[in-house]
Design a protein with these regions (language model features):
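C-terminal motif of bacterial Sec signal peptides marking the signal peptidase cleavage site
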Residues: 13-16
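Short, exposed beta-strand-loop hairpins at the edges of beta-sheets
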Residues: 119-145
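Beta-strand-rich extracellular modules
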Residues: 82-84, 135
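Aromatic-rich carbohydrate-binding modules that target alpha-glucans
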Residues: 32-74, 84-110
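Exposed beta-strand face motif in extracellular beta-rich ectodomains
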Residues: 75-77, 128
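Extended low-complexity, serine/threonine- and proline-enriched intrinsically disordered segments
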Residues: 38-42, 141-146
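Bacterial signal peptide processing site
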Residues: 18-21
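Sec-dependent signal peptide recognition
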Residues: 2-8
Length: 146
C-alpha cells in the first residue's frame, strides 16, 4: 500500500513538472529600425541595381536627393531605394509590384522586406531629381522632378 501511494505521488510530481500552464508571456514588438538616409542609394535598371556613389542620396535643405539622366524611350524604369547590402529595413519601395511614380507627385514608400519595385516612365529625355524625405510610420516620401 505504501509502495502504491509512493508511486502515485511520484507520478503526480513528474507530470506536474512536465505540464505547461495556459499563461504565456507576450512578446514585445520591437520598433522598426530608423531609416539611415545617408546610406541609401537609388538602385534600378539605369545603374544595373548597383549601389554606386553616383546614385547615393545627398542631403540638402529639402531632404535627400539624387540627380539621374534618363532617356525617354517609352519604357518604364524599375527602381527602388536601398543601402549597399539590401538590408530589409533599409530597402524602400512600393506596396505593390510596378507601382507607378509620376513627375511632381508625392508618393510614400514602405521600407521593409517585401516592398516592391517602383516604375517611372520619363516623358522627356533629361536629368530628373529623385527627392526623398522622412515620413510617418517608417515610410519615406518621394517626389521626382525635372
Amino acid at each position: 500500500m505504501n509502495r502504491t501511494l509512493l508511486v502515485i505521488i511520484f507520478s503526480l510530481f513528474v507530470s506536474a513538472c512536465s505540464s505547461t500552464s495556459g499563461f504565456s508571456i507576450p512578446e514585445v514588438a520591437q520598433p522598426a529600425p530608423k531609416i539611415q538616409f545617408e546610406n541609401l542609394h537609388l538602385r534600378g535598371v539605369f545603374n544595373w541595381w548597383e549601389a554606386t556613389s553616383a546614385y547615393q542620396f545627398k542631403k540638402d535643405s529639402n531632404g535627400w536627393y539624387v540627380n539621374v539622366e534618363l532617356i525617354a524611350d517609352g519604357q518604364p524604369y524599375d527602381f527602388r531605394l536601398s543601402d549597399a547590402i539590401w538590408t530589409p529595413s533599409q530597402s524602400c519601395g512600393g506596396n505593390y509590384k510596378g507601382q507607378p511614380v509620376m513627375v511632381s507627385t508625392k508618393i510614400f514608400l514602405v521600407c521593409k522586406q517585401g516592398s516592391e519595385n517602383l516604375q517611372f516612365t520619363p516623358s522627356n529625355t533629361g536629368i530628373y531629381r529623385f527627392q526623398i524625405a522622412p515620413a510617418d510610420d517608417n515610410e519615406v516620401s518621394l517626389v521626382i522632378t525635372r
